Amino acid sequence: MVSVDRQRAGNGNGHLIELRQVVKVYENAAGGFRALNGIDLSIDRSEFVGIIGRSGSGKSTLMNMITGIDRPTSGEVRVGDTPVHQLSENQMARWRGRNLGIVFQFFQLLPTLSVLENVTLPMDFCRAWPLRERRTRALALLEMVDMAEHAYKLPAALSGGQQQRVAIARSLANDPPLIIADEPTGNLDSKTADAVFALFESLTAEGKTVIMVTHDTALAQRIPRTVMIADGEMVPPTPAGAEAEGQG
């Protein structure tokens, strides 16, 4: 039986994430579009990795493979000891809730729930924490992102940057080892974007693995490791910072 328990160790090769010869083909009227072509990628625990590339390059498809939102046409996707590409839909939901925190560009907070309720929601879904501990944990996470004083407000009362901070707190609700951030600073001013970036840096220092998709060239140059995707393939590494220079 495929394990969907919390991933606390890497796989047999010591990596938290490993993609092996991942191919993704989308069928269309013309026959088929190859969005990913033989991707081999390994990411270790506590790494902060940026995924960069032009629109349509395949970077979003790559993230969908890692999160299990989509499945490869061929190849393997492993996170810890779990073959993500082999999970059933029910197993996928459980695995994702326990092992993965996702931060989107547009926050996606539920508008009718308070900030505190938005953060406790993943805990309620996965039942990973005792009921009596959930509120305390949510408040601690909001304190970490400097949003505890807004705990009982609705999202509409917050600025975009504040909502993104809440979204980060929510992504940490079940203490996942892996955080996926898809253009998390895309709609933020530079000062707020810097603060959000600093939060991700602190998470890797605490042992989390963070993968960030970004078009922000200045931000990409600050990420310790970047992976460039072009035409569905990984571009060979170039000197530090050079990967970001071609991103418009």
PLM feature segments, named:
Residues 1-25, 236-248:
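ABC-family P-loop ATPase nucleotide-binding domain
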